[in-house]
């Protein structure tokens, strides 16, 4: 159980807040604060899992990004070439006129895959990055 409550302020784009409020209503949260605490706990759990994985894995890196952001498409291509030893293939999907989804199949040492995840996550224009570990190599 958490100790005490600390009040913080967060700036969000209106469309992101509207979508969050819609989800809060659908899921039955009593407040934004409760939903934000839940989202932060989920993020921390996923981060800890990513940090704890070791050894060789096979998985898919799912990247959602806004292709209108200058340089993001080129950066993703450059990173795929820079990490060619762990990337077996990739698929590019046009979701709408603004957003693209890149599915990158990875196979290799988790430590190296984490570096790729961090570089993609930090890129301006990238909206979401998710690593799904399909198989742990033996």
Swiss-Prot record:
<dbReference type="GO" id="GO:0010045">
    <property type="term" value="P:response to nickel cation"/>
</dbReference>
<dbReference type="Pfam" id="PF08753">
    <property type="entry name" value="NikR_C"/>
</dbReference>
<dbReference type="InterPro" id="IPR002145">
    <property type="entry name" value="CopG"/>
</dbReference>
<feature type="binding site">
    <location>
        <position position="100"/>
    </location>
    <ligand>
        <name>Ni(2+)</name>
    </ligand>
</feature>
<feature type="binding site">
    <location>
        <position position="92"/>
    </location>
    <ligand>
        <name>Ni(2+)</name>
    </ligand>
</feature>
<dbReference type="InterPro" id="IPR045865">
    <property type="entry name" value="ACT-like_dom_sf"/>
</dbReference>
<keyword id="KW-0804">Transcription</keyword>
<dbReference type="InterPro" id="IPR050192">
    <property type="entry name" value="CopG/NikR_regulator"/>
</dbReference>
<dbReference type="Pfam" id="PF01402">
    <property type="entry name" value="RHH_1"/>
</dbReference>
<protein>
    <recommendedName>
        <fullName>Putative nickel-responsive regulator</fullName>
    </recommendedName>
</protein>
<dbReference type="GO" id="GO:0016151">
    <property type="term" value="F:nickel cation binding"/>
</dbReference>
<keyword id="KW-0805">Transcription regulation</keyword>
<comment type="subunit">
    <text>Homotetramer.</text>
</comment>
<keyword id="KW-0533">Nickel</keyword>
<dbReference type="GO" id="GO:0003700">
    <property type="term" value="F:DNA-binding transcription factor activity"/>
</dbReference>
<keyword id="KW-0479">Metal-binding</keyword>
<dbReference type="InterPro" id="IPR027271">
    <property type="entry name" value="Acetolactate_synth/TF_NikR_C"/>
</dbReference>
<comment type="similarity">
    <text>Belongs to the transcriptional regulatory CopG/NikR family.</text>
</comment>
<dbReference type="InterPro" id="IPR013321">
    <property type="entry name" value="Arc_rbn_hlx_hlx"/>
</dbReference>
<feature type="binding site">
    <location>
        <position position="94"/>
    </location>
    <ligand>
        <name>Ni(2+)</name>
    </ligand>
</feature>
<keyword id="KW-0238">DNA-binding</keyword>
<dbReference type="InterPro" id="IPR022988">
    <property type="entry name" value="Ni_resp_reg_NikR"/>
</dbReference>
<comment type="function">
    <text>Transcriptional regulator.</text>
</comment>
<dbReference type="InterPro" id="IPR014864">
    <property type="entry name" value="TF_NikR_Ni-bd_C"/>
</dbReference>
<dbReference type="GO" id="GO:0003677">
    <property type="term" value="F:DNA binding"/>
</dbReference>
<dbReference type="InterPro" id="IPR010985">
    <property type="entry name" value="Ribbon_hlx_hlx"/>
</dbReference>
<feature type="binding site">
    <location>
        <position position="81"/>
    </location>
    <ligand>
        <name>Ni(2+)</name>
    </ligand>
</feature>
């Amino acid at each position: 159980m958490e100790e005490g409550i600390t009040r913080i302020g967060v700036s969000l784009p209106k469309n992101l807040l509207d979508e969050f409020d819609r989800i809060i209503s659908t899921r039955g949260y009593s407040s934004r604060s409760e939903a934000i605490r839940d989202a932060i706990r989920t993020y921390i759990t996923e981060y800890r899992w990513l940090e704890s994985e070791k050894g060789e894995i096979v998985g898919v890196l799912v990247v959602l990004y806004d292709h209108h952001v200058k340089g993001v498409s080129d950066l993703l291509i450059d990173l795929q070439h820079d990490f060619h030893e762990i990337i077996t293939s990739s698929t590019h999907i046009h979701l709408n006129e603004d957003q693209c989804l890149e599915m990158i199949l990875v196979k290799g040492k988790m430590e190296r895959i984490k570096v790729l995840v961090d570089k993609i996550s930090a890129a301006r224009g990238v909206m979401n990055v998710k690593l799904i570990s399909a198989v742990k190599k033996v």
